[in-house]
Amino acid sequence: MSQEPDRLFAQPLAEVPDFVFNEDVVRVFPDMIKRSVPGYPTIVENIGVLAGQFAQPHTTLYDLGASLGAVTQALRRHVRIDGCKVIAVDNSPAMVARCSEYLHAQDAMFQELLPVEVIEADILALDLQPTSLVTLNFTLQFIPPERRLELLTRIRQALLPGGALILSEKLRFEDAAEHELLTELHVAFKRANGYSELEIAQKRSAIEKVMLPDSLEQHRERLLAAGFSKVVPWFQCLNFASLVALP
C-alpha cells in the first residue's frame, strides 16, 4: 500500500491550524511518525514482543488510540496464544478507515493471525472488557490532562491479574537544562530526517496546544494513583519513552 511523504507543513501558512488526525494527516502518517519520533519502529515491534509475555488465553487485547494500527499489527505478529482477540480503537474516522485497510492487507499476507475488531470511538467513553493487555502508544498525551487519571483507573480496573498496560509517550523534563538539551536533540533528529526549519516550526505551532506531554515522574505517580503496583520504563530515545505498568 503506497505511502506519501510528509509535506504538510512545507509551505508557509498564513495561520497554522491546530493539529488534527484528518485525511491529510492519515495520508502521510507513516512517514510523519517515523521521521518525527526517534525509536518508533523499535517501540512498535517490541510492544508485540512484550505482549507475548502478558497476553493470556481467551482474553481481549486493546490498542487504544490505534491510529493506523501499527501496534495492532505487531500484536498480531507476535502473540500466539489461543483465544486472544485484538480490539483497535480510534476516534478519527479517517484513521479507522485506513487502519481497516492495512489490517485487511495483513490478513491477505499472513495466516493464523489474531482476530481483530476496529472500532471508531472515544476511548474515554469506551466500555472496557476484562483484558490481559492494553496499549496506549502516544495516545495519553492527546487526552485532556484532567481526564488522564480517570482513563488509567478504568484501564487498571479492567486488567486481569498478570496483565499489563504498555504506555508510550513524549516526555517533558522537570530539569530545565535537561528539557532544553533533549528538545534540541529532537529537533536535530527531525532535521536529519529531512524536515526544514519551516516544517519543524509550523508543526510545533500546530501541535503544541493539543499534545501536552508529562514528565516521567508524573506518569509514574499517576499510574500508581490509578492502582498499578509497579511502573517499569523499558525504552527511551531522546524525549520519547515507553513504560510497562503492572496491576
UniProtKB/Swiss-Prot annotation:
Report which superkingdom the organism of origin falls in.
Answer: Bacteria
Q: Which NCBIfam families match?
A: carboxy-S-adenosyl-L-methionine synthase CmoA, PRK15451.1
Function, in words: Catalyzes the conversion of S-adenosyl-L-methionine (SAM) to carboxy-S-adenosyl-L-methionine (Cx-SAM).
InterPro entries from the xrefs?
CmoA, Methyltransf_25, SAM-dependent_MTases_sf
- Entry's PANTHER family? CARBOXY-S-ADENOSYL-L-METHIONINE SYNTHASE (PTHR43861:SF2), TRANS-ACONITATE 2-METHYLTRANSFERASE-RELATED (PTHR43861)
Which parts of the sequence bind S-adenosyl-L-methionine?
Answer: Y40, G65, A66, S67, D90, N91, D122, I123, N137, R204
The chemistry this enzyme catalyses reads: prephenate + S-adenosyl-L-methionine = carboxy-S-adenosyl-L-methionine + 3-phenylpyruvate + H2O
Q: What is this protein called?
A: Carboxy-S-adenosyl-L-methionine synthase
Q: Name one GO biological process term.
A: tRNA wobble uridine modification
Annotated GO MF terms: carboxyl- or carbamoyltransferase activity; S-adenosyl-L-methionine binding
EC number of the protein: 2.1.3.-
Query: Would the keyword Transferase turn up in this protein's UniProt record?
Result: yes
Instruction: Give the multimer and partner information.
Output: Homodimer.
What family is this protein classified in? Belongs to the class I-like SAM-binding methyltransferase superfamily. Cx-SAM synthase family.
Identify the species of origin. Answer: Ectopseudomonas mendocina (strain ymp) (Pseudomonas mendocina)
